[in-house]
Structures are given as structure tokens and as C-alpha cells.
Amino acid sequence: MSLEIFLRSAGHGIPATINGEPMAGVSGPVTIAGAAAVGNAEILAGIVVNQLLEPGRPMIYNLGLAHVFDMKAATAVTGGPENALFAQISAEMGRFYNIPSSSWVSTESCFTDQQAGLEKMFGFHTHLSLIHI
């Protein structure tokens, strides 16, 4: 699906956000560093394909969609502290490659409550401190 989108949008100068989304412990190594390395490889592969289709196409590096898997509860953790680490890694790798980076902020709460507010605040603090677009 991604390749089809890349093909259809190539040649129009549309910036492409390349997302790496390994799930630590499932589709990537269980460690944050290992999952970040897999996500980085995914992103670099997407950038190479896009640059072959349209040399000079603007790219956005996004490892912020990576998350971990809670093996005890058998569920993906999308609002845990590990997500802030992935956002920081995304920002630093974007700076390393001199590519704009992006990420996202999520929560584990199912309601608009204090937990949701606290987790979003931690996420936004991370983004406001480190990530530039």
C-alpha cells in the first residue's frame, strides 16, 4: 500500500512522512534501542524508495509511531514512557540525517481524565523540548 501511495504522489513535490512503526517485543527487538534500529531501517528504506521515484522530494522522518508490547496484558502500549523515548530518538535521528522529524502524543487512558492529561502533558513536554518540524 505504501509503495502505491509513493508511486501516485511522486513527481508532484508533495512532502512524504516516512513512518517507522516497530512494536518492541513483537515486530522488533524487545529493547528500545533494538526497536529504534529496526524503525530507522524502515524509514531509511522508505526514504531511498521516495528519492529514487522523485529525487529531492521533501521527507519527514517519523519514528514516533513506534511503541512497545505489554507481554503481560498482551496489548500495545501507546501512551507509556517508552513512547517519549521513541519521540526523542526520532528527533535526534532526524537531526543526524538533517531531515525534519515528527512524532505524536498518546495516552493509555480510555477517558478524558487526570491520567490522560498527565500522559499528554509528559508527551507535549517532550515534543516542545526536543522535536522541531
Segments the model singles out, each with a brief description of its role:
Residues 131-133:
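Conserved small/polar residues in nucleotide/adenosyl-binding loops
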Residues 1-129:
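Helix-rich catalytic cores of soluble enzyme domains
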